[in-house]
């Protein structure tokens, strides 16, 4: 153990109940404030779209679920939540779609009714389909003008050769334009079967009553047949893959990415520590050496992206056009220094303290608690996963950080993508 001040978060008091139709309910009572966060998680994201890969179907469906149910139109959905002082929103990623409402506890019952209605009884009205499709087309166009989004898409399509995360969550315009309302509704019926959903509630509620209420709303929905989606395993990365994208920019924006294991792998904590030592903040090695000392970049950072599938260890930077080669070499040189010279105890302990503080902050509000439980469940089916992660983070030894740098950050096996000024 590196740090004698070993801290441990107590196990969650959240409960899990499974209804007869397979829908799972997770409830965490917290009466510290009269607030509730309720979330519906669907195990369907852009990587699960099968024959429609690249069309952005999951994201489009997220938009359309707010457009009307059997009992409410779009305005009535929004007004019902606002009347309780609540806020409703949603997001879609590679492997999930999440709908959430934050509300004062006095409005919990009505907001729960709205959330269940939206997720389980959506109509996807034809008269809303065309207008919402136009909204998403504008989103796609905005993304094509956003350098960070363009660079991220370039990284994923280059780093992955067969895994469906190489397609953007929002989809490609030409494939998106082929979607019809019936295609979307068929996908909805398939993916939003109760056994592919779970509901998380955290806050000022009674757990038994909450489970009963959710069962009254959703327990009568029958499971629907869902074809299994087998995700291809990304083959071993061989060599250096490169892509350079001309873009309307004065700077060169670069990213270097190395394949790393999924988020539940035992090496995850050591990789997170390595990323923070290299590129998290002004005290990081890359900032001090490559930006301040050598003045080769305008900005630089690092992060470890470890989802439910093979992830990426990413180093990013912005630099002047004439400095990109030198910046690349200097950044790779800092990795070599970790491999040859190791890391310091105070560097590791600083990262651990920051992670503990971040986790504590996450658990101080209801949405943070609900999101933590939901993410843990969809990733590992262990509600205490992040608590276990914090324990593991504090057990990382100096040699573990060097080992993962040696094992995963090979100098002849990574992806390099960049945005360069248009000629």
Place the predicted regions along the sequence by residue:
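Polar low-complexity intrinsically disordered regions
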Residues: 1-3, 240, 413
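N- or domain-start disorder-to-order transition segments that initiate the globular core
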Residues: 1-35
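Charge-rich, well-structured scaffold segments of protease-associated domains
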Residues: 12-13, 18, 26-29, 74-228, ...
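Active/ligand-binding-proximal structured segments within catalytic/core domains
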Residues: 22, 30-81, 256, 266-278, ...
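His/Glu-based metal-binding/catalytic segments typifying zinc-dependent metallopeptidases
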Residues: 39-41, 226-283
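Short amphipathic alpha-helix segments
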Residues: 285-293
């Amino acid at each position: 153990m590196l740090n004698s001040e070993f801290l441990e978060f107590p196990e969650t008091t959240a409960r899990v109940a499974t209804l007869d139709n397979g829908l799972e309910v997770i409830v965490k009572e917290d009466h510290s404030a009269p607030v509730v966060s309720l979330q519906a998680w669907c195990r369907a994201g852009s990587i699960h779209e099968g024959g429609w890969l690249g069309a952005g179907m999951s994201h489009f469906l997220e938009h359309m679920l707010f457009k009307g149910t059997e009992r409410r139109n779009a305005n009535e959905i929004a007004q019902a939540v606002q009347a309780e002082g609540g806020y409703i929103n949603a997001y879609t990623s590679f492997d999930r779609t999440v709908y959430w409402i934050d509300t004062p506890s006095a409005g919990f019952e009505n907001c729960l009714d709205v959330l269940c209605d939206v997720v389980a009884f959506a109509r996807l009205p034809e008269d809303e389909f065309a207008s919402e499709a136009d909204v998403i087309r504008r989103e796609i166009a905005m993304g094509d003008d956003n350098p960070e989004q363009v660079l991220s898409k370039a990284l994923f399509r280059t780093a992955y050769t067969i895994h469906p995360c190489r397609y953007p969550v929002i989809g490609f315009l030409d494939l998106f334009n082929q979607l019809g309302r019936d295609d979307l509704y068929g996908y909805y019926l398939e993916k939003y079967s109760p056994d592919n959903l779970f509901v998380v509630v955290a806050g000022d509620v009674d757990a038994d009553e909450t489970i009963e209420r959710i069962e009254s709303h959703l327990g009568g929905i029958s499971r629907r047949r869902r074809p299994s989606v087998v995700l291809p395993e990304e083959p071993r990365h061989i060599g250096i893959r490169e892509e350079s994208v001309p873009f309307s920019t004065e700077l060169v924006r670069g990213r270097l990415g190395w394949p790393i294991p999924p988020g539940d792998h035992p090496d995850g904590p050591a990789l997170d520590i390595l990323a923070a030592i290299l590129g998290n903040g002004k005290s990081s090695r890359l900032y001090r050496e490559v930006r301040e000392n050598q003045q080769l970049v305008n900005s630089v950072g690092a992060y470890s992206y470890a989802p439910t599938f093979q992830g990426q260890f990413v180093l990013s930077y912005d630099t002047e056009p004439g400095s990109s080669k030198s910046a690349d070499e200097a950044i790779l040189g800092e990795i070599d220094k970790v491999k040859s010279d190791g890391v310091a105890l105070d560097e590791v302990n600083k990262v651990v303290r920051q992670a503990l503080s971040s986790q504590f902050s996450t658990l101080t509000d209801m949405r943070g608690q609900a999101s933590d439980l939901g993410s843990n469940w969809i990733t590992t089916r262990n509600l205490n996963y992040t608590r276990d992660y914090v324990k593991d983070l504090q057990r990382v030894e100096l040699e573990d950080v060097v080992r993962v740098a040696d094992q995963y950050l090979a100098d002849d096996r990574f992806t390099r993508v960049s945005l360069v000024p248009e000629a």
